[in-house]
């Protein structure tokens, strides 16, 4: 198994040997660096903390800067932690993780933050059918309807679907195939769509 951090570049199409168009997502994957090695003795579990997308020192908070300097790596915008068993090889602080750890045909799961849609009603957010257009209704077309009876249950249940902020959720899509690996450009081409807008950060992990 393998894992890496990346940034979504955008979508494109590739053609297979049967001249069929395959929708693909291009991801800038790595290079990442190990910023911390967590051990069972010290932290209670074994994991690697890796970082991606370098940033200037004057843009980095002092505590974070000290954390990066301790590992001998440059400050980065994105940090994530992965369990040690995900990686096939033993890693040390400062080691580089490249996109070449993947190969064509690998099955991966991609995690990211979905696009934010802002405040949305129940029709857009949860695909409610809305109220009747006839029988005297005037302003109930996109209304949620009843959210709890008066005599029973005399309350609104927790988790009731209502209007609110849509999107900006942590999303993982599993079962995606690696179509192409371009180590010289640090690019990973994956079949299908992945969460989030362009230039958003992603976690790519090979499936078992």
From Swiss-Prot:
GO terms for molecular function: rRNA binding; structural constituent of ribosome. It comes from the Bacteria. Keywords: Ribonucleoprotein, Ribosomal protein, RNA-binding, rRNA-binding. Pfam families: Ribosomal_L3. Residues 130-168 are annotated as: Disordered. Signal peptide: none annotated. One of its GO terms (cellular component) is cytosolic large ribosomal subunit. GO terms for biological process: translation. HAMAP family: Ribosomal_uL3_B. Part of the 50S ribosomal subunit. Forms a cluster with proteins L14 and L19. Belongs to the universal ribosomal protein uL3 family. One of the primary rRNA binding proteins, it binds directly near the 3'-end of the 23S rRNA, where it nucleates assembly of the 50S subunit. This is Large ribosomal subunit protein uL3. It comes from Chloroherpeton thalassium (strain ATCC 35110 / GB-78).
């Amino acid at each position: 198994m393998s894992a890496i951090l990346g940034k979504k570049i955008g979508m494109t199409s590739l053609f297979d040997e049967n001249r069929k168009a395959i929708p693909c997502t291009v991801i800038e994957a790595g290079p990442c660096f190990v910023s911390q090695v967590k051990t069972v003795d010290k932290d209670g579990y074994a994991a690697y903390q890796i970082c991606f997308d370098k940033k200037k020192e004057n843009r980095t908070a002092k505590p974070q800067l000290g954390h990066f300097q301790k590992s001998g790596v440059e400050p980065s915008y994105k940090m994530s932690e992965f369990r040690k068993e995900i990686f096939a090889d033993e890693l040390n602080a400062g080691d580089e993780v490249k996109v070449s750890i993947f190969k064509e045909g690998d099955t991966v799961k991609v995690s990211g933050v979905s696009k934010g849609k802002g405040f949305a009603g129940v029709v857009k957010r949860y695909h409610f059918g809305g109220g009747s257009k006839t029988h005297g209704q005037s302003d109930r077309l996109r209304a949620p309807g009843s959210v709890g009876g008066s005599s029973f249950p005399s309350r609104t249940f927790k988790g009731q679907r209502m209007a609110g902020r849509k999107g900006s959720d942590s999303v993982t899509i599993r079962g995606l195939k690696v179509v192409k690996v371009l180590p010289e450009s640090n690019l990973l081409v994956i079949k299908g769509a992945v969460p989030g807008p362009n230039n958003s950060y992603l976690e790519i992990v090979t499936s078992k």
